[in-house]
A protein has these predicted regions:
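Extended, low-hydrophobicity, polar/charged segments
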Residues: 4-183
Length: 183
C-alpha cells in the first residue's frame, strides 16, 4: 500500500521522508562541517511528543539505532548530556560516575528549551545553546549509523558515529541499561 500523507511517502506502514526536509540548526551545522548524514522525517501533530521507540517504528528502523538525547544536572549544577538507544534507560549512577559527579538527575522538562534551545521530543545533541559534556552509549561504537533528533519534532538525522564525533565532542560510555534500574 502506497500513500502520500503530509508530504511523506507511506509504504506498507513505513514512513519515508520526501526528498526535501526543512533544514534545522543541527543539519546546517553538519552541512557547514561538510559531514555526511541523511535527513529523515515522520508525521508529528503539533505538540505531540513521541517516544524514540514509536519514532523508530514510524521511520522503519530498529529502536536500537534510534537514540534519544537526555539532559541532566549534577549535584554541583553542572549539566551533562546523555545520548542512548531509545529502547533503553539512562543509568544515572553510571553517568554520574563516568562524568565525575556524586549524583546526577534529569533536568525538569520546563528547563529543556531555555537550556538547550530545543524542545522536549526534539532535542538534538548537535548545536545546543551551550556546549555541555556529552556521553553517548558505547552501544553506538560498532553501529554503521545512529539516528538522533534533528532539533525539532518530526525530524531525525541518520549519521555515522564517527561523523557525529566531528560535529560534537563526546565520549563513548556504558551509561544505559536494558531495564529501568533505581538510581
Amino acid at each position: 500500500l502506497l500513500a502520500i500523507i503530509n508530504g511523506l511517502i507511506h509504504l506498507n506502514g513505513i514512513v519515508m521522508a520526501k526528498d526535501k526536509v526543512d533544514k534545522t540548526n543541527a543539519m546546517r551545522a553538519l552541512d557547514q562541517l561538510k559531514l555526511e548524514y541523511e535527513a529523515l522525517s515522520y508525521p508529528c501533530a503539533g505538540d505531540e511528543v513521541l517516544g524514540g521507540v514509536e519514532v523508530a517504528g514510524l521511520i522503519g528502523e530498529s529502536a536500537s539505532v534510534v537514540f534519544k538525547t537526555l539532559v541532566t544536572h549534577s549535584d554541583n549544577k553542572d549539566f551533562v548530556v546523555a545520548v542512548i538507544p531509545s529502547d533503553e534507560y539512562l543509568s544515572l549512577k553510571k553517568l554520574a560516575k563516568i562524568s565525575g559527579h556524586k549524583k546526577i538527575e534529569m533536568i525538569p522538562v520546563a528547563k529543556i528549551e531555555s537550556l538547550t534551545g530545543y524542545i522536549r521530543g526534539g532535542c538534538s545533541p548537535i548545536k545546543m545553546k551551550k556546549t555541555f559534556p556529552t556521553f553517548i552509549s558505547d552501544k553506538a561504537k560498532d553501529l554503521p549509523y545512529i539516528i538522533i533528533s534533528a532539533g525539532k519534532r518530526g525530524a531525525q538525522i541518520k549519521i555515522a558515529p564517527e561523523n557525529l564525533q566531528k560535529a560534537i565532542r563526546y565520549q563513548f560510555a556504558d551509561i544505559s541499561d536494558v531495564e529501568e534500574v533505581e538510581s
